[in-house]
Structures are given as C-alpha cells and as structure tokens.
Amino acid sequence: MSVTFDKKDDNVVVVIGTGPGGGVLASELAQKGVKVVALEAGGRHGPEDFVNDEWASFVQISWLDSRSTSGDWRVAKDFSGLPSWIVKGVGGSSQHWAGASLRFQEHEWKTKTVYGNVTGASLLDWPIGAKDMDPYYTRAEDKLRVTRTGGRKGLPGNNNYKVFEAGAKKLGYKNVHTGRMAINSKDYDDFVACQQTGFCFQGCKWGAKWSAGYNEIPIGEATGNLEVRINSQALKIEHDKSGKVTGVLYADADGKEHVQKARIVCVAGNSIESPRILLNSASSMFPDGLANSSGQVGRNYMRHMTGSVYATFDKPVKMWRGTTMAGIITDEARHDPTRGFVGGYELETLALGIPFMAAFLDPGGWGREFTSALDQYENMAGMWIVGEDMPQETNRVTLNHDVKDQFGLPTPNVHFDDHPNDIAMRNHAYKQGAAVYDAVGATRTFPTPPYPSTHNLGTNRMSSKARDGVVNKWGQTHDVKNLFVSDGSQFTTGAAENPTLTI
C-alpha cells in the first residue's frame, strides 16, 4: 500500500538507509504502527532487474560516489578511490552479500577482558553479551531462514566446496560444512529455493537469498506506515536549541533540497556514510559533529582481516557453479594466542567470475605468470579469509574538505593501518588456506590481497560510558536522546564472523 507523508509531519521516524540495519528497522517499526519515512540514496532493484555480468552489475548497484583513502593498507594502493564495496539502493548491501549468517562467539563480546591489553588496539567490551543476544539471534535466523538453524537443512555443496572439504579433512579440521546461509534451502511462500546458478554478488535473480530490499521493505510498505523515498541523499541532521534532532535535510534525484521533519532519526548508512552524516551535521552546539562529545565519531573503523587463497588443479573445478560462498571452516575462529595473535578467523569458499578475477587476483599483475593463472580458471578453486581485526582509534573516517561531492559537501576519507595482529593472522590464514589445497593436489596456490571492504564496521561504536563511544546498548546516541544508529558502525569490536546477522 503506497503512502506519502507530509514533509512537515514531525510525528514520523526518519530512517536513513534501507540496508540490513535500516531496512529491517523501518519495516519492523511500520508493522508496529509507527509512521516511518526511509530515505534511500540510491534507486530500487529487484531480482528481475539484476544482471549477470560482474562489471555491469557493479555499475548498476554499487556506491560509486567520490571517496578517498589513506594509510598503509593494501586497498589504499590498489583501489585508492574505492575503500569499500557496498550497495547504493533499497536493501543496501543485503542485495549483493553472499548470505553467510553467523553468531558471535561468547568471548567475542568481551575482548578487552579476554584478550587483555593489546598494544596499539583500542579494545573495549561490548555493553551487551551472548545471553542478551541469543533470543534476538534466533529471531533473526528465523526471519532470514538461515540454513542449519531452526531445523532448516543446509545447502548442497558444489565442486568448490567439495575440494575445500576434502582438503580440510586431510588437514584434520573438524568443523567444515556448507555454512549457515540466508539462502533458501527449500521453497518458502513466494520465495523459491536456491537454484545454484551462482554469481550471488550480482544480486539473487531468483529472490532465494534474503535481502532487506525485497523481503522486508515490502512488508513494511504494505502496512501503510512506511514510505521509502529513493534517490534521496541525506545531507545533514537538524536539531533545535535544546539539542533534540528535528529532521533531516536531504537532496532528491534532481539535487533539490528538502527537509523531512521527524520525532526520531535513525542513521543506518553503513560505517562510512553514517559518521560522515554526523560530522557534516556539526553546528555551534555540536562543533565537532553531531553526537560527538566523545570525539569517537568516525574512529575505530574496522573492515575485518581479509584476504583470499586460490588454487589450480589438474582437473576442472568450475567453482562458479553454485552459491558463491558454499562452505566454511570454523576451526580457526577460536581465541588461541599460541598461534601468534589474538582472536580468530574463518575460511569460507569464494568464487569470482573471470572479469573480477582478472582485477583482484593480483592487482597490477601482468606477464605470463599472471595470465597463466587466468588460463587455468576452469581448474581453479577459491576461498576467502575473514577474521577479527583490531580496533584502532587512528583508523577512522574523516571529512576530506579538499574534495566535495555533487551536493557541495566534504567527501569521506577512510584511513586504515593494519595492526600487527591483523598481519600475523593474515599470514597464518594464507598458510592454512594454501595447505587445504595442497593437501588435495593443488598445482599452484595464489595468496590474494584484500579487496575493497564489504564488512565496514565501527566508527559509531557502542559503549557503556559516553566517553568511550557514540551509542549505548540500544543504539541510542549518548548525546542526543532521539537520535539512533542502526548499522555496523555500532560495532565495538568486529569478531571473526560475517556481521549481517548481528546487525
């Protein structure tokens, strides 16, 4: 049911962003009778619109606005204008995610207590824990129809997984399976089971993979309490003399500016845009940015310790067939400092098409050694490494006043330096990943550097004390009581697990 709210209606809740955080929140509020206006910077695409072409899809759904990078991380060298790969559109990055849906482990909520003082890291215990989150995890798993939870069967393993599983078992790994995935393993109502056509990063053409865009938003809209305004870029959050937020200034598709009044504002623009909006909302009352009395807005940016390992074999694997992320090894996700680092990591199968493989296998690579790897694409298997990176106050999102966007506002700069713990963990993971493939006869292995970040975390972190973060355990900002954050920027620490289920 379509609805349009008056821009002067100050009884609405404005949600900025419609991804896993904002989209679900907007829909849930609408179902409870709350009037919601969701401002979405991008357009709207459903399964019928997605294209099975990696670069065409990248242009179709990605957030490509101007951004800059700094720091010693490899991404700043290889992709200086693309620090992250996120979606600009209804559903946010749940449109292109692989679907891995994992719970934090108990110790990962209390890393300051468990890991102790790690030099150079700004570790902090979350103000919530496993017991608080378990019932919400169960609700989320049911909503997302996560496989291998709630009695739901797992997805079948493709060839990429079979190679991965065989190598894992030869190494003695015990916890290897086809993962907990927000991808239908059977038909549900109007959503079919996964058809194993692959290329999940380009959007699910069947609608079998959960997305806030086509699973949650339509439910909220059907109540008559949710209006989604597409191509509406939030520019600034306004407040009154008491410091209470009163609305959001945004620009429409034609660049015309509007103000939507609100009684509550929820920021859910991902961990780069959310702090950027708060910083761009600076005023005489909030000179360092809205809700930033602690100076923590933008700080403690995390993106997970990542990398990939690919391998070639003497027989075809055809890794692109079936789900992009078809299996997981969780044995290394434990906290075991004897390995030379705190925290842990997951190994997850991954498949890229030839266009992406050419760009990401060895950025800047050339010559026969590089091209011969691509020649063996049909015989290639692949995995992604994802582990807990250390929060650091100096890893942060700031405003780049030298580069303005199409609306005349400073663009975000993402600064990231790898912590020594991240480097030690990545090297360990490269070794173990290669060993998995060597155990089953790999002819070559290829440790691959991190891609532009898909797991953007921190920058508005959750804390018990106002001085240590930006929001409390409810996502409510410490400084402004009717301003909330509802995305991965709340994360106090990153854990080893993919973040969407927790968001």
How should each PLM-predicted stretch be described?
Residues G17-G19, A41, G488:
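Glycine-rich Rossmann-fold phosphate-binding loop(s) that bind the pyrophosphate
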Residues S62-W63, A76-K77, T113-A234:
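Conserved redox-cofactor binding core of oxidoreductases
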Residues D78-W85, V90-S93, W126-P127, S294-P412, ...:
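FAD cofactor-binding and catalytic pocket of flavoenzymes
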Residues E28-Q31, K35, G42-E54, T223, ...:
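Glycine-rich loop(s) and the adjacent beta-strand/alpha-helix scaffold that form part
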Residues V13-V15, V36, V265, L483:
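Conserved hydrophobic helix-helix packing surfaces used for dimerization/oligomerization
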Residues G179, A193-C200, L235-E238, N379-D389, ...:
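A glycine-rich dinucleotide-binding beta-alpha-beta segment and adjacent secondary-structure elements
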Residues F5-G21:
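Beta1/beta-strand and adjacent pyrophosphate-binding region of the FAD-binding site
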Residues S57-K153, D314, V386, E393, ...:
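Redox-cofactor-proximal catalytic regions of oxidoreductases
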